[in-house]
């Protein structure tokens, strides 16, 4: 069912008579603020797009009954603040995009999304997910995106946290446990260093660091790395030689990293 750009639609219809629906597109329904609870009855639904539903602030918990849902797009829902507590029940979910939302805290059940392969919170400037599940859900003590534990997302291959106002590299420590991760975008953030355990990512191929203007050093990176995008990393001063495996890789650095290369110093390791 394609209802995209129905700009006067304020509530979704009752879906109880179309339970065999596999795709539901509500992209660009800029007046939509309420989703009918019968959405949870769509047992065969595998694709749901609510992209750019600017008035949408929440979803009924029954959305987590969508056992076949594989792709869920919530990007551009700038007023959307909170996922249902049982979000982790979406056990078949492979892709979740929430770019530009106002999500503040991830439910603890998020760690149960073992099939999740693509996750994007680009432009969520916070204060989104807290690293401590026991903190008050309405806490206003955070001024930047603070990562929640992600270590159990063993299938995750692509993660975008660009422009999330991450200011402390230590909050990225949990990334070192994402054993399947291939593409990691941390561009446009405010951290000074990256955690050393990023070297534990055996399949990491692409690392995005563009416009991380406070970043001063790159630690050892996994040998699987193929591309480091670091344009406008104007404070970058030190790169571990071990990040590139050999002197040859260091000589060919310009093919792999884009930064003010003339003043970068290479070290045998960064503690």
Kindly give the residue locations of the regions a language model identified.
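Predominantly recognizes leucine-rich repeat
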Residues: 1-144, 149-169, 174-271
């Amino acid at each position: 069912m394609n209802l995209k750009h129905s700009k006067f639609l304020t509530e979704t219809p009752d879906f109880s008579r179309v339970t065999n629906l596999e795709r539901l597109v509500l992209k660009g329904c800029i007046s939509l603020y309420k989703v009918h609870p019968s959405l949870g009855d769509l047992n065969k639904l595998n694709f749901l797009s609510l992209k750019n539903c600017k008035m949408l602030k929440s979803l009924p918990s029954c959305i987590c009954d969508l056992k076949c849902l594989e792709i869920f797009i919530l990007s551009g829902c700038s007023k959307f603040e909170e996922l249902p507590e049982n979000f982790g029940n979406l056990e078949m979910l492979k892709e979740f995009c929430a770019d530009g939302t106002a999500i503040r805290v991830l439910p603890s059940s998020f760690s149960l999304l073992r099939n999740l392969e693509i996750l994007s919170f680009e432009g969520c400037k916070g204060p989104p997910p807290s690293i401590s599940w026991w903190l008050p859900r309405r806490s206003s003590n955070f001024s930047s995106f603070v990562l929640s534990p992600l270590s159990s997302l063993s299938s995750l291959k692509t993660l975008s946290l660009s422009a999330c106002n991450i200011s402390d590299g230590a909050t990225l420590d949990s990334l070192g446990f994402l054993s399947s991760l291939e593409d990691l975008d941390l561009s446009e953030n405010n951290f000074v260093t990256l955690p050393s355990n990023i070297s534990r990512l055996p399949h990491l191929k692409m690392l995005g660091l563009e416009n991380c203007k406070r970043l001063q050093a790159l630690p050892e990176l996994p040998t699987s790395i193929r591309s480091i995008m670091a344009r406008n990393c104007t404070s970058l001063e030190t790169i571990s030689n071990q990040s590139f495996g050999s002197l040859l890789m260091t000589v060919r650095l310009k093919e792999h990293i884009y930064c003010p290369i003339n003043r970068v110093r290479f070290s045998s390791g960064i503690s």
